[in-house]
Amino acid sequence: MDMAAKFQDQTVFHMTGKRAGESLTALTTGFRPALLAPYRDLTRLRYDYPVVLVEGDASREYVRSLSSVVGGLIAELAPRGIEGERLRKQLLRLERELRVLVADGTTGLLSDLWPEAAARAAGRDDGARDVLTRAAGALGIDGEVIDCSRALTERLVTRAWKSVNAEKARAFRLLVDHLIRKLSDILRAAFVHSQAGQQPQALKSGFGDLHRDTFDFSAMSKLVTRNVPKDELPAKRRQRIEWALAVLRSQPFYPGSRGSGAKGEPYAFEFDNCAAAIEAHRARLPRLVELVKAIAIAELEARGGYDEADHGPFFERYDEHALTADDLAQFPDYLVCIPADRNGAPENAAMMEMLSAGMPVKVLVQHGDLLEEAAIGQGHFAFGVRSARLATTAMGLGGLFILQSTSSNLYALRDRVRHGMGCRGPALFSVFSGSPDAAGNLAPYLSAAAAMKSRAFPAFTYDANAGTNWATRFSFENNRNTGDDWPVEEFAYADENVQRVNEQLRFTYADFMLCDQRNAHHFAVVPRERWTTAMIPASDWLLLPENQATDRVPYVMAVDGSDKLHRVIVDARLMQATRRCLLLWHRLQEHGGIHNSHAEQALAREKAAWQAQKEQELEALRKAAASATPAAAAPAAEPVAARAEAPVAAPTEAAPAPSSDQPWIETIRCSSCNECQNINDKLFGYDGNKQAFIKDLNAGTYKEMVEAAEACQVAIIHPGKPWNPNEPGLEELLERAKPFMA
C-alpha cells in the first residue's frame, strides 16, 4: 500500500484543519521555523541593534549602531597587529555586556551604561576595567541606547524628525535675525536723522561715558538740526516696518530668534493622533500666513525694493491661498506618531484625507499585529485597509513620500527615513514593530525580520518627487531575493544517522505565521516515521496546478525547543493566505520593474517577430539555393540577393501591439487615484476592479486626454494621436503628449 494513501489523516487535516486521532500532534510553544533555529540568543550576535540615538543636532548622523560605535573605538584605540588584540577583545566583550544589559531591560544613556558594562567585561581584572572606563572618553558621542523593541520605532523616527527640524530652525533663525537687524537699522537711521534724534539728550546717549562731559550737547543740537531733512521716514513705511518687526520678534514657530518677544508657549508639532494635528494646523494657519507676509515685506524693505503702488494691493489680499511650497518648507512639519493600538481610533480616521490634502505632516503608523483571522467580507481594518496594504494604497494618493519597513530594517534605512522627513509635503511611514506578546516569546527583532523575509511586510520606498516614472520613484529596500517568490537560505542539519545534510529552504508566509502561537491550529506536527511522498514543501505546493495540488500536502520545516527537526503540515486556509501574500508580492515586483507583465509581453512580441523574420530569411535562402544552377558564376551571391529581396514579416503580425496612434490605458497598473475621472468621467471609466479604461472617445477632447496623462501618478495613460483634426491647439498638445506615447 502506498504510504501517501495509508496516512489519509494528513490530507484530512490539510483540507479541514481538523486532526483525527493521535498520529498528528499539535504545534506547542517553543516551535519556530527551522531557519530561525540559530537565533535563540541575539546577545551573542553582532548586528544592527541595539542602537544609540545620538544627542545633539549638529550632526546628520542621528543614530548609530552599537557595533559601529565600538568598531570605531577599536579602530581608533587598538594598535594594529597582535599588540592590539587584547584591547580589541576587551572592547568586544564590553559591547556584548552592553547588549545583554539592554536586552534585560536596562535603559539609559551610553555614558551611563558604559561603566557597568566595563565592570562586567573586566571581571576581576582591575587593569582592564580602568582601560575600558578610560576608553569611554574617546567615544565622541552620547545618547540613549535602545534595543529593537516595540518602543524603538517611534523614538528613532522622532529623532530623525528632530534632526531635520534642527536644520530648518537654524536656517530660519538666521533669516529672521538678519531681517530684524536690517529693519532695526532702518528705524535707527531714521531716528538719528530726525528732529527727535538731534535733541541734546539723544545726542548725549550716542556718546560713550568717557567724552560725555567734554561736549556741549545743547550747542551741538542747534548746529546739527540745521541740516535735518524736512521729510522724515514716511508714516506708512514706518508703520509697515514696525508691524513686520513685531511679527518677526513674536513668531512662535521657532523660538529663540534675535529679539524674540513671543508671548506664551512656542508651538508644539508632535502629536499622537491625526485629529489634533489637523486642528492645530488650521488654528495656526492665519499666524503662519502673517509671518510669511512679514518676511516678504521685510525682505523688500531691507533692499529698498518695496513699491507701495505695486506691492500694497498684493499684500492686502495675501492669504493662505498665496502660500507656496517654498513658504511652507521653511516651517516645521507636523509629526504624528500613531500608537499601534490606536490605528482604528476615530481620531485617526481622517489620515488619508490629511495626506491627500497635502498638509505638511509626517505620519508614523505602527503595526503590532499582522494576524488576519476575519472571514472574507467581514471585519474592520484601520484606515479601511489591511496593515500590509496601507502603504501601497497610499501610493495612489500622489505627491507623497512613503516608506514601508519592519523595525528590524529601520537602522539600515536610517538615511531614507531622514530623507523622508526632509521631503516637502506629506510623508507616511508604515512600520511593523513585531508581533504582540500574545503571539509568543519570539524577540521583536526576529518577529519583525521574519515578517519582512516572508513577504508578509516587505520593505520599500516610494518618493513622488524623485522622478516622473516608477523606475525613479519606487525602490525595494533590503528585501532578499527580490526576483523570486520567496527568499532562499542554506540550511544544515543532522539526519537520523547523525550525518550532515545541506538543504535549501524557502522562507514563506506560512513560516512567518508559524512564529505566532495563535496560529497553532493551522499546523500539525508529523512524526518522522509518518513522512510520505505526498508531502511537499509549501513553496513548491503553491506552484502546482490545482488538479495536482489536491493530491499533495504542504509542509514547512520547524524545530522544537530542543532543536529537533520536524515537518509541520499546513491547512488549506493558511495556504490560501500564503497565496494572497504572494499575489501582493507579485504586484510589488511589478512596481519595482521585476517580472513586469507589460515588459514581458512586449519582449514576447519582439521575440516572435524576430523569429518570424529569421524564418522568412531562412526560407528565402532555401528557395534561392534550390533554384541555383551548377553553372552559376557566383552561386554564393544569390542567397544574399534573395535574402535582401525576401519579404520580412512585420512584428505586429505575430502579436499585435497597441498602436501609438490610438489612445490606450494600461488598465492593470491603475492605482485608482481618480485623477482621470476628475477631468472627465464620461471619457474615462472604471471596470469591476476599479481600474481605469477609456469609456467613450467622443465624450471628450484630446486636450482632456493629454491632461489626464500628465496628471496620472503611475503614467499609464497614452494619448495617441488626436481623433478630431479640428480641435484647437493640437500642435502644442501633441508636443505635450510625446512623453506618454506608447
Spans of features found by a protein language model:
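Glycine-rich beta-alpha junction loops
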Residues: G368-L370, N409, F432-D437
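Catalytic or ion-translocation cores adjacent to nucleophile or general acid/base/metal-coordination motifs
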Residues: N348-A349, E353-R389
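Conserved thiamine diphosphate
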Residues: T324-F331, Q378-C423
